[in-house]
Every structure is written in C-alpha cells, then in structure tokens.
Regions:
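Carbohydrate-interacting/catalytic domains
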Residues: 6, 20-165, 171, 177-180, ...
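Short, flexible loop/turn elements at secondary-structure junctions
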Residues: 64-66, 78, 93, 107-109, ...
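Hydrophobic faces of well-ordered beta-strands that scaffold small-molecule active sites
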Residues: 160-162, 235-237, 285-287, 383, ...
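Bacterial N-terminal signal peptides that target proteins for export
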Residues: 1-9
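Active-site-proximal helices and loops of the catalytic beta/alpha 8
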Residues: 69-72, 270-286, 292-315, 319, ...
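Bacterial N-terminal signal peptides
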Residues: 8-18
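Substrate-binding/active-site clefts of carbohydrate-active enzymes
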Residues: 166-378, 410-416, 433-434, 455
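Short loop/turn motifs at secondary-structure junctions
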Residues: 68, 160, 231, 250, ...
Length: 667
C-alpha cells in the first residue's frame, strides 16, 4: 500500500515523532544547492517498497536543507519503453531539528526494471543525486534500481553467517577419521595430523592430503557454540561431497557425503538441528556448490582413482564413447582438456547449450544435484556457487552470454523448488553484472566491496597480504561505489567477511594486533550486508596463505571469557536487536583522513545509530554531525558497547573512543 505523508500532521521521520505546521528557514533560495544536506537511499524511510511487486507504486523521499530547494523531481529510466520519465516532487514535512525538508514523489506500478535519480534546483542552481553520489551534471550511471518481483531472502538480510571448513572445525566422530596412508591420490599418501599441529604436509607438494578429522558430527555437536556463544544463525559449509582432498573442491561424487565427514544421514541430522531450536534459534544452511569443474577422480572423468572407488562406466578421459564425454571439453583427447586455472585435477565441466545433459545433471531436473539437496530429506536453504562467473560451455571461462544464460536457468530451477532459497555467487570483482537484474544471483561474496577495502584500511594490506593502504576518504568512496550499482535487497545480502578460506587470516594481515581485529569485527557487524564470520575470526585466529588459513579451531578460545569472542557475541546481539543495523539506511557522517576516524549512520523508523570507528592506535575524541540523523539537541545517546551516555550539543555528538575500536551510538 502506498505510504503518504500529509503536510500538516504528525509524521514519523528518521525514527522521531514530529508535529509541524510550518517551515523554519535553515537555508535560503540563493541559487546554490546545499549538497551536504541532500540525502536519499533505498532504506525504508526513503523508499516505501524497496522490493516491490509489479503492482506496487513506490513513494520516494528526498531530504534537503530546510528552505533550500525551489523544485525537485524524480527522473527514472524505464526499460519498458527505453525512455526517461519525470515526476515532480512536493514538499511533505520538515524534521525535528529544523534542519531538513522532506520531498516526495511516486513512481507508478509496473513490472519493468527502472533506474532513478533525483534532480533538484535552487533557482538557477541544479544538482543530481543518485546511488553514486551528488553531481552538478546529469549522471550517466549509478542510478537507484527498481526491479519489480525480485526479492532476496529476508533470513539473509537479518542473519549472521558462520563459515566452516569442515576438516578443521571439530572431530565429532573419530571412527571416520582419515588415517596415515589410508589411500594415495595424485602420488600423495594421506597424512593424519594431530589437532592443533601444523597444516603443512610432511611430504612436499602433498598439502591437499593432510587431514585432522573434523566432520559433520563435530559441527552438529558445536551448534550450541555457533548459535549461542557466537550468535550466528546461517551456517555456510565449504564442500562436503566425496573427494580425495581435504578441501573437497575436486568433487568425485556430488550425490555422496565424503565418508571422512559422515553419511547422508549425518548431513540430514545436522540440517535438521540447524533448522531446529534445541541448540539456539532456528537457523539456515548453505552448501558450497562446486559446479565449474569436477575432480579428475569423478566417474564422469575417470583419470584418477583412489581408495576402493569403482565406476560402472568409463569416464570421458577413458573413452570417447563414454556417456560423459560431452561433460568436458578436450582440445586433444585425452591429455589436453579445459580445467580450472590449468589444474589438471579439476577438469572443467561443459554446460553445452540450453537443455544439455550437463545442465540437467547440475540444476535443471528434479534429480539434479542442486534440486536434490533443496528437496526432502535434506531441505538446504541455499547454494554458494564456487567461481560462479566461470560456468560455461566449450571450455570458455565465463563472464559471457552463455554464463548469464546458465545463471538465469539455474535461478529459475532453484526458485521453482524454494522461492526463498539463497543463490550466493563467488566473484572477487564488481559482481553487478550478475546482480542488477534480479534474474541470476541474490548476492555475492563481497571481496570487492568489503573484505578488500576494510583490510586495506585497518591492516594496510589487501586480502592476499600484499601491502596496500587507504585513507578514510578513499575507503568511503570505494564502499559507496561498490553499493551504487546494486539493488538494495542485494546490498543487504552481500556477504561481508574479514577473511575466508581463500585469503590470509585477517589477524595475520593486521600483524597479530587483536585491537585491529576488534575494529574489524565492529565494522563487520554494523555495515550494510550479511556479516560472514570465517570460523576462528571471532577470536583472531591467525594464518598465512593457503593452506595456513585453514588451521584447526582452538576450542580453548571458544567462550566469552575470550575478549574477542565476547565482543563478537555482543555485536551479534546488538545487530539482532536493532533493525537499523540490518536493513536501515546508510549515511556517511565523517571521514577524517588526518586522525583516521570514519563514522557512518544507520537509521530506520525505530532507531538512529551512529557508528564511529577509530583506526588510530591512541584513544581519541571524535565529533560527529548528529543532526544528519535528526538527533535533537539535548537528547541522550547511548553507546551500545560501553553503556556510556552522551548528549547531542549544537547538532553534534562528541565521544571518546579507544585506539582501534569503535562506538555504536543509539537513539
């Protein structure tokens, strides 16, 4: 239903009740648009329906300096007629501080995709505002997006993810542990290492055959820690299907849980316990889908064997008459074939044309891999797609029309089983091409828009450990740019990790400084998107490049007696209590390149929150513009981390923040 705000009545704006019958002048009609006051985004305060249906008209709100604008309008491009449309906006209210005016206009309902910006004038002065920022010239990109009928899962928006590399988390069933020399694969014998010892192999070049015994039963037994102590309610598991390696990214059989991790029954029990409430709030589970390539031990390929695995038919490597021959691309059979980054042990799957056997095998049929685990008796809640941009045909490496066709088909297949399932793509760059039309992924692993810039700002290194340092202004520009081309529902489900199984550990990049880990955790749990905690990051686990970023979990740290774990628990709890931190608007408040302070606001109809981050080593005071959040003078504001209360004075908040720490100031 369209939300309308009457002119001379009590209104709810930015979380405060305000009654005004007139407009006090804060600015003047001086032929100069006051840009620092302009704001809008697709939070619920400024967009009446961020994820509309085709039947929903959308009331859009713009904030400006009080008394500044002489006119405002919405300009939107409609893909239905490939034309721009212009909608005049009208003044609807001012705010409790007497600082801002609010203007509103309505985009009519339709089923077509649209992009919009605001055009504002003060006499002879004109400016435009869109998702990319404010300009004096009409922008050519970065418009806010409206995609009727596209909705990302609310459980992703409101949840906290916990990523687990199964072999290194907890050994819950010693009977399935891989032993020394249990089998050989690609010339390497398996090595059984004791928990807490080195992840590096005793035999050079055999790192993928080092095992510690972690399994699905172990994860099940530790759900109380994950759901309760940490507070996470979305569990993302690195690959669990049958494979000769410890990482399982070289799948042998997609329909069988690896024996070292358990059985189909073990997986079903784990999923039921994640969904249940016996170990904490009901949760969700996402499996890792490695569908760009298989392992060379797959019965589909048949180059390598291990253990007692036998295949009923020859694989593509063994015979050109194999029923699986077209599952792969050979340049010169059998030895030259397309593979993942040239790794012969990971032959690339060939998706062929629409309707191909490969597409039916992976996603398009009821018995396909993806649909099998979405359906009973498993009922997983989503898939993370490994190297998702690369799925393709004829040995091509993706990011092309065929890849997008595959992803559209894949989405249709997944949502036909569960419309609320998550499709999470792995991509290290700007993933907008898969996210800006609502027909492919719901979100992506946010390396580009969170992991990398936050690491460079706090640690002075990128996610790989390479030296790279940015200041607060650059940080803010990169964060804004990464959000600008994404629908708001996607922004709210991008997974924000400090590190993953493919990066150096955050604590290691930060030189082992636990204070910087604290700062990273505060940023992660208050930023826009789904926080994704890689197991051990909650206590500052260290580790260099693969395989050192996959150390075993230190269970002596797994309690709130550990300061970092206690902070993580508190931050997750705060995020759960304050919807503004999950789906509220995001506004930059301060970028201090000299004192290394960055502040932003999160706000919705219930709360206004200022997050202030101190990236210097010493305690500092910071003054942030509370008026930007419509906090009134004299009103109290509480730091949710310390419990300390401050008061707004002259439109500002002045707070003291310890080195490499933050404040979460709520009203």
């Amino acid at each position: 239903m369209l939300r309308r705000i009457p002119l001379l009545t009590c209104i709810l704006l930015v979380g405060a009740l305000s009654c005004h019958a007139g407009r006090a002048q804060a600015c003047t009609h001086d032929n100069k648009v006051e840009r620092s006051y302009l704001f809008s985004d697709q939070g619920r305060l400024y967009d009446s329906d961020p994820e509309p249906t085709a039947n929903s008209s959308i009331a859009l709100t713009l904030r400006a300096c009080r008394g500044d604008l002489t006119a405002a309008r919405i300009e939107y491009y409609d893909t239905a007629d490939a034309s721009f449309h212009r909608i005049p906006m009208h003044w609807v209210s001012d705010d409790p501080t007497g600082t801002f005016d609010y203007w509103q206009g309505t985009v009519p309902a339709s089923r077509s995709k649209k992009g919009y910006r605001f055009r504002v004038t003060d006499g002879s002065s004109t400016a435009w505002l869109n998702a990319a920022g404010i300009t004096s010239r009409e922008p050519s990109s970065g418009d806010f997006l409206i995609i009727p009928g596209f909705k990302t899962p609310d459980w992703m928006k409101n949840g906290v993810m916990y990523q687990i590399f199964p072999d290194r988390f907890y050994d819950g069933d010693t009977s399935n542990d891989v032993t020394n020399g249990q089998y050989r694969y690609a010339g390497c014998a398996t090595e059984r290492h004791a928990w807490g010892t080195s992840v590096f192999p005793k035999v050079k070049g055999c790192r993928t055959e080092v095992f510690f015994g972690g399994d699905l039963a172990g994860i099940d037994q530790k759900l109380g820690y994950i759901k309760g102590t940490v507070g996470a309610d979305i569990i993302y598991l690195n690959p669990i299907f049958m494979s000769p390696s410890n990482h399982k990214y070289d799948t042998q059989n997609y329909y069988r849980v690896d024996p070292a991790f358990g059985t189909a029954a073990t997986l079903q029990h784990l999923i039921a316990d994640i969904h249940g409430s016996s170990n904490g709030p009901p949760g969700h589970v996402i499996l890792d889908g490695v569908f760009n390539h298989s392992g060379d031990s797959s019965c589909w390929f048949g180059k390598e064997t291990y253990g007692s695995i036998s295949c009923p038919e020859p694989g593509a490597f063994q015979s050109q008459s194999s029923p699986y021959y077209r599952y792969y691309t050979f340049q010169s059979w059998p030895d030259t074939y397309s593979s993942f980054f040239g790794f012969g042990g990971m032959p690339k799957l060939d998706y062929g044309a629409s309707g191909s056997a490969m597409r039916r095998q992976i996603y398009a049929s009821k018995t396909s891999v993806m649909q099998t685990y979405l359906r009973p008796p498993y009922r997983i809640d989503g898939w993370r797609l490994d190297v998702a941009q690369s799925l393709d045909a004829d040995g091509r490496d993706g990011s092309d029309a065929t890849n997008h066709e595959i992803m559209r088909e894949l989405r249709a297949a997944v949502t036909s089983v569960n419309p609320d399932a998550e499709i999470l793509g792995e991509f290290w760059g700007d993933a907008a091409a898969w996210l800006d039309d609502g027909k492919e992924w719901d979100g992506a692993m946010n390396y580009n828009g969170f992991t990398r810039p936050i690491s460079e700002w706090i640690c002075g290194e990128d996610e790989t450990g390479k030296s790279a340092s940015i200041n607060e202004s650059t940080l803010d520009r990169r964060l804004r740019a990464s959000r600008a081309d994404l629908p708001v529902g996607v922004q709210e489900t991008m997974t924000n990790a400090l590190g993953t199984h493919d990066t150096e550990r955050f604590a290691t990049r930060c030189g082992g400084d636990i204070r910087k880990v604290y700062l990273g955790l505060i940023f992660q749990l208050t930023y826009l998107g789904t926080p994704a905690i890689y197991y051990g990051d909650e206590y500052g686990m260290q580790g260099g490049p693969d395989p050192d970023d996959r150390r075993t979990f230190d269970w002596s740290r797994a309690n709130t007696g550990d300061a970092a774990v206690a902070l993580t628990h508190k931050l997750v709890s705060i995020r759960g209590r304050y919807s503004a931190l999950r789906t509220g608007s995001y506004v930059t408040l301060l970028t201090d390149d000299t004192r290394h302070i960055y502040a932003f606001g999160r706000l919705d109809a219930a709360h206004r929150i200022a997050v202030v981050l101190n990236n210097a080593s010493a305690t500092q005071t910071a003054t942030v513009p509370a008026y930007q959040l419509s906090m009134t003078n004299g009103s109290p504001v509480t730091d949710l981390l310390t419990g300390q209360t401050y008061r707004v004075s002259n439109g500002n908040l002045t707070v003291s923040i310890e080195g490499h720490y933050g404040a979460i100031l709520s009203q």
